[in-house]
């Protein structure tokens, strides 16, 4: 039996479909209602919450493999407590539940946000991106946003489990791209292109196809004895303008053409912060999202490609696939509502 958390999320929904296609029995956790995903009727759904330690221990009965994909992604200041509870405490509960049942293998979906960073002054002075891989160390003295900190602390919980005998492997994907809800996760970038906005922020973004994340996660967890290691997953880095431009072209829409200068982005996030404090509404842009991509970073994936003998899909191919899928979904919804 394979147990999956985060089945309603981008990685979880594709992972469950892949596990079912392989003929594996799947048990998955849900909170409020069973997510409407492909193969949902072939899954044993268990109502619960990763913050419920006792409930998780019961859910792992007869389980041989656990895929922990659940997590909260947010840069809003009001979500700091939730990030701690879901990402850190939730992962600690998963680890403890696995340790209660010796022999379980855990595949944990972390993030490149948990890698830490290095200064890379020479590279930056030469106009080159700073390169990071699995050996990157977390700088305890540096300023980190709440999301990155939560993923780092969550990963520490997995390393704790490993030190106590847990067989676990960790993947650190960059921004995962795939066709999902228009209003969730990275798909909002594609929605931005579809809506024909005029402005874009200069900078780069590291991307990886959700299909590659799922395939590599499954192979590392199910098909290898590897334990106590982490693997960076990223197809490459592209300018945000190019990503939005390609998506707009796939949708047959006009791409954004006006770059937002840094000073304007700095002003906007401050105004949004004040508005959020006064109204309680979530900010449309935060300090972290305003500054994302300014510092050029590139993630090296030599380790996973050598280990699995597998390369990543090109970003352009992923964008084209996502846009085609999203257009098909949109047309289907239009037909159903007409």
Model-identified regions with their sequence ranges:
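Substrate-positioning beta->alpha
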Residues: 93, 153, 184-185, 201-222, ...
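Mid/C-terminal beta-alpha module of Rossmann-like enzyme folds, strongest
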Residues: 216-284, 301, 306, 311-338
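Conserved Rossmann-fold NAD(P)-dependent oxidoreductase catalytic core, especially the SDR/UDP-sugar
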Residues: 89-146
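N-terminal Rossmann-fold cofactor-binding loop
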Residues: 29-34, 50
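NAD(P)-dependent short-chain dehydrogenase/reductase
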Residues: 162-207
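Active-site Tyr-X1-5-Lys
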Residues: 142-169
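NAD(P)H-binding glycine-rich loop region in Rossmannoid oxidoreductase-like domains
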Residues: 43-89, 97
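N-terminal Rossmann NAD(P)H-binding glycine-rich loop of SDR-like oxidoreductase domains
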Residues: 1-22
């Amino acid at each position: 039996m394979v147990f999956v958390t985060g089945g309603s999320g981008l990685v979880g929904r594709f992972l469950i479909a892949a596990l079912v296609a392989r003929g594996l029995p799947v048990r998955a956790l849900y909170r409020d209602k069973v997510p409407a995903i492909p193969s949902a009727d072939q899954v044993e759904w268990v109502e619960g919450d990763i913050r419920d330690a006792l409930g998780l221990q019961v859910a792992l009965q007869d389980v041989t493999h656990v895929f922990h994909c659940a997590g909260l992604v947010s840069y809003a200041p009001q979500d700091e407590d939730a990030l701690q509870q879901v990402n850190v405490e939730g992962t600690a509960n998963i680890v403890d539940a696995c340790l209660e049942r010796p022999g379980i293998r855990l595949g944990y979906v972390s993030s490149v946000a948990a890698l830490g960073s290095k200064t890379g002054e020479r590279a930056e002075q030469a106009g080159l991106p700073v390169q990071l891989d699995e050996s990157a160390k977390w700088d305890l003295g540096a300023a980190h946003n709440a999301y990155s900190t939560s993923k780092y602390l969550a990963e520490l919980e997995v390393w704790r489990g490993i030190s106590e005998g847990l067989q676990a492997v960790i993947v650190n994907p960059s921004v995962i791209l795939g066709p999902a809800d228009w209003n969730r996760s990275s798909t909002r970038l594609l929605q931005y292109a579809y809506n024909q906005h005029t402005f874009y922020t200069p900078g780069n973004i590291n991307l990886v196809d959700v299909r590659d994340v799922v395939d590599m996660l499954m192979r590392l967890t199910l098909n290898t004895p590897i334990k106590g290691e982490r693997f960076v997953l990223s197809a490459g880095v592209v300018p945000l303008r190019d990503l939005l431009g390609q998506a707009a072209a796939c949708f047959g829409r006009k791409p954004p053409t006006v770059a937002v200068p840094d000073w304007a982005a700095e002003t906007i996030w401050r105004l949004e912060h004040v508005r959020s404090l006064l109204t309680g509404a979530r900010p449309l842009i935060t300090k972290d999202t305003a500054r994302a991509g300014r510092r050029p970073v590139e993630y090296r994936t030599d380790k996973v490609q050598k280990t699995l003998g597998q390369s990543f899909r090109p970003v352009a191919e992923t964008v084209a696939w996502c846009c085609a899928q999203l257009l098909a979904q949109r047309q289907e919804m239009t037909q159903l509502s007409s």
